């Protein structure tokens, strides 16, 4: 079923959210996109195609004994996407006044998640450049996992040294051990 929580321990749902189970042993799974009220749809244990920019979360509780009228199972999500964080600092002879824009080349979209393991299959190709979120002199982007030997392209536009015009810098960001793994920054 589809359940929504706005505070710990309180679930609301559509189409009658109460879950009634016979006594037995069950495997429970939960997926969230930490973004909207509708997480990805799964068919035969595999998600619909996933997208960059979304903080996918996954949880499981395997072989849970249900043998009473009411049980509580705590859900502790883990991140299954990955994220890139770039923090700028001025060096010798330069003062950064503002990070104006940041673009990064994330993996192609369309990877899927396995419901039983929470694994998002890593992409093997880069997609189109996308805007990163900016907070002060820090840029951040959540993306699907990727495995590739080539680096990602990062383009930064900054205001520096109180100049009237901005400067644009492009650099190549290598993937640690050739991969941005799920749950890592």
What is the meaning of each model-derived region?
Residues 1-93:
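Short, low-hydrophobicity acidic/polar segments
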Residues 2, 74, 131, 168-172, ...:
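Well-ordered beta-strand positions in beta-sheet-rich domains
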Residues 25-33, 150-160:
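Short, aromatic- and glycine-rich surface loops/edge beta-strands on solvent-exposed regions
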Residues 28-30, 86, 102, 156, ...:
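Generic structural hydrophobic/aromatic packing signal, biased to beta-strands
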Residues 39-47, 164-176:
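Edge beta-strands of extracellular beta-sandwich domains
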Residues 60-152:
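Short helix-loop boundary/capping segments
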Residues 177-185:
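A recurrent domain-boundary module in secreted/ectodomain proteins
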């Amino acid at each position: 079923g589809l359940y929504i929580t706005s505070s710990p321990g309180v679930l609301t749902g559509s189409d009658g959210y109460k879950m009634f189970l016979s006594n037995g042993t069950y495997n429970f799974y939960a997926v969230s996109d930490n973004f909207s009220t509708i997480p990805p749809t799964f068919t035969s244990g595999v998600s619909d195609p996933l997208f960059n920019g979304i903080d996918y979360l996954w949880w499981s509780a395997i072989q849970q004994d249900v043998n009473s009228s009411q049980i509580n199972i705590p859900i502790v999500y883990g991140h299954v996407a990955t994220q890139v964080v770039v923090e700028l600092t001025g060096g010798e002879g330069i003062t950064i006044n503002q990070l104006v824009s940041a673009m990064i080349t994330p993996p192609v979209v369309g990877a899927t998640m396995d419901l039983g393991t929470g694994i998002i299959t890593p992409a093997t190709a880069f997609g189109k450049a996308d805007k990163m979120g900016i907070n002060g002199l820090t840029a951040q982007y959540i993306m699907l996992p990727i495995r590739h030997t080539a680096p990602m392209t990062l383009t930064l536009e900054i205001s520096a040294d109180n100049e009237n015009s901005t400067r644009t810098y492009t650099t190549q960001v290598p993937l640690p051990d050739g991969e941005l793994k799920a749950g890592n920054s």
